[in-house]
Design a protein with these regions (language model features):
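N-terminal leader/targeting segments and the first structural element of proteins
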Residues: 1-30
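Long terminal segments
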Residues: 1-11, 50-118
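Well-ordered beta-strand segments characteristic of repetitive beta-sheet solenoids
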Residues: 5, 20-22, 36-38, 53-54
């Protein structure tokens, strides 16, 4: 089941499709492997924990509406647009191990769509 993920302002910005992260047009932008998030170029870029995506500094980037993971605060969420058709998934590259994870921090200063698309 696909769901919108919200940024620190409560705006829906990316889509979680159950195994990966997609842009608002339904195109794949990041892999999720266990609790790790990888770019399409197989670089470790963050963590996925209890419905929250954290950046490489372990700062909250986006979250699902039913997330139970650590958030600095839960913003009011705006309405969500309809979900687009989802594109096919290309072959997944070999993914390297993940670095050590720092302690939880605040909200990320990164723009979620830009950060996850790199």
């Amino acid at each position: 089941m696909s769901s919108w993920m919200f940024n620190r302002h409560g705006k829906p910005v990316v889509i979680y499709d159950g195994t990966n992260i997609r842009d608002p047009r339904g195109r794949l932008i990041a892999w999720i492997n266990g609790s790790n998030v990888y770019s399409l170029q197989a670089r470790h870029i963050g963590w996925f924990d209890s419905g929250v995506v954290y950046d490489s500094k372990n700062k909250a980037l986006v979250f699902l509406s039913n997330a139970t993971g650590h958030l600095p605060y839960r913003p009011a969420m705006s309405g969500t647009p309809g979900l687009p058709g989802l594109s096919g998934i290309p072959g997944r590259p070999g993914l390297p191990g993940a670095p050590g994870r720092p302690g939880f921090s605040g909200w990320s200063d990164e723009d979620a769509l830009t950060y996850l698309s790199k």
